[in-house]
Amino acid sequence: MCKQLLQFFLIISPAISFAQTKSDSLKASRDTTRQLQTVEVTGRKDNSYKNERSFSATKIEMAVKDVPQAISTVTKELMQDQQAFRMGDIVKNVSGVNQFSGYDDFTLRGFRSTTQLLNGLRTVTGFWSMPLLVNIERVEVIKGPAAALFGNTDPGGTINSVTKKPLDVNRKVFGFSVGSFQTYRGTIDLTGPLNEEKTVLYRLNLGYENSETFKTNMGTENLVISPSLSFAPTNKTRVNLDLVYSMSNGKLYRGQPIFGAEAGTQLNSTPISFTIGKANDFLKEKNVSANISLSHQFSQNFSFNVSYLKYQWNENLMEHRTSNGYAVDSAGRQIPTLMQMMTIRRLSKKYNDNMTAYFVSRFSTGALEHHLLVGYDFNQFSVPVGGSSETSKEGYRLKNGTVGNYVKANKENFILDANGNPVPNVPHFNLLNPDYSIATTSGYITTSTATAPARNMAHGIYLQDNIRWNKFSLLIGLRKEFYKDKFNYSKPAEKQVEQNSFIPRIGLVYNLTPDINVYGIYVQGFMPQTSSTMVNPNVGGPFDPLTSRMYEVGAKGDFLNRKLGATVALYHLEQNNVLVNANDPNNPERLEQRGQERGRGVEVDVNGRILDNLSISANYTFSETVITRSADPKMAGRLKENAPRQQGGLWVKYAFRNGQLKGLGAAAGGSFVTQRRTFSEILELPGYAVANAALYYHFDKIQLAVNINNILDKTHWIGGYDYNRLFPGAPRNIQATIYYTL
């Protein structure tokens, strides 16, 4: 990798140097009124719901309205006002984004997405749980394919979390919350300079949460420790170091089950709090990341940026779950009140190394102003040797010490209980009388499997030029992506697949008025299939990579003296080569490529202040995401799973600044999602609307807040796969918070 990087920069350096020489005669640009960062390494001091500038969509700082692609942002101020510290709560403020399930799993513009970035670099998601995000400055959602800059990403969009950076002023904020479901949360945010020259800055974010949740036997404990340092030896060089340690202790939630459901079965047939498991089940996850960034400004118009992120995820799992079948009696008849059970004991790790380096140059060619970016990035994902899975054998105990499916004709070979029924390997779960006590697992007959090591590597060279002329701005980007996937890495049975692609992006912005821009963009996407699908002979691969393309037009504007920002976007998005199960009764692992899926829609986002003391965040989406081509003719024309036609959200906050009510504030809002298809042909999730509100009181250095979520106590489901895996939203809950600022 280092050799490739060196060769690449030796090739492009003369061209950039030439461009820089030519730029010496260029007059100071429109940005001379403030010293712009070339990479995000310093903190944001704004305190609005509106975010004016972004790095995520272009890797250079640009005004959001100058980027020819929809970008939605949720700032820390909105997160704090809503007490939204998990991604599932945060994305309710973003058009076109909804939860696919109760996991770290979302739908963006109708397409499922698990790609998440941290400070513009790729992370590893544990999937099963959403971490506590007390260290996040803002969350940005880049709508549509972002592959031209980041390589293989999901077509619907990419979520980028930006960590809180050190500030050059001393500030200490302590927070404590208590609320429904025995929830307790404490937060600490410390920042300031470490020397008189303010060349060394620090920030430390701490968060701890303990909650029983509204689900039976599903308590969680979460801890986040996130220190950050910034070092600026000169006004041209800055180094930033971010460390994040995140720990989660809980249980793996498989969703609210309704076994034996038929078409029309009511989703409240079981309580939304109902779960299956044992008291000694656990899911322990640890995430550790280290991100170091360097930015150097050679001159006003020429800079270099490099950033590296090391991310590690560890899982330690023990769970009792159903094997999706009823127990049987001595006659082989099903007992619909007893579920067959199994256990999974798993240890696993995932590593990710992500590096990006690029030059940025400003220069002119005649009347054209260029903002050129040339870069290289490398990403390596690894599943190391040492992972293992121990799974209980499904079925009933035989007298010879093994486990098998019960056969009435061979009844004499099975161990029977006092009622003459076969004894299961793992005790059944009684649906009428649930038992969540501690289970004795030492007697289970299990099978152990070592996790196959895997490694995939992606690297790319990318070029981007933002060309300005008069009221026009043209964004041109091109990336060459190289992808290599190794299964059974470093073993004799190692298998390897390589794929590569050219990925273009072109967008145009027209400055209609000083405060309103209109834009259009065409962009392509690329996402290789996973190693397990490409080299496993049972699934029918290798398969072609996922490819996508998007056309988008829209308008962005700043209003009310730039206090309020709005975006309207219309898009057409296509994805090809989607993998789905072939439903082959002789080979349940076999997959097939569906063909094509298409999404069309319109999105509206509004964020900022209407008055100095009246803030608003609003979003609305109308879309249709359908399967357009499929090997199964009956699938063509169907809506995609968990892709609602309409969704939206609203949050309005009013703060009294004068008079006897000075310091008092109130907020109200909510969100809605219309009905959605699932993976089950007989289940459609109902739409829902949830109302929320909050009261605030601020005096001296203390701020008090009371948040009420789901005021009307509406039973609703945020996502789901089928009747056995439903994900209900929380019932009415209250949270009281106090902040003390020094």
Model-derived regions: residue spans:
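Surface-exposed extracellular loop regions of Gram-negative outer-membrane beta-barrel proteins
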Residues: 189-216, 220-226, 287-362, 456-488, ...
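Acidic/polar loop-and-plug regions of large Gram-negative outer-membrane beta-barrel proteins
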Residues: 209, 213, 226-297, 312-350, ...
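Structural signature of Gram-negative outer-membrane beta-barrels, strongest in the C-terminal barrel
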Residues: 232-234, 350, 369-373, 377-381, ...
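Gram-negative outer-membrane beta-barrel transporters
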Residues: 471, 572-574, 593-680, 737-741
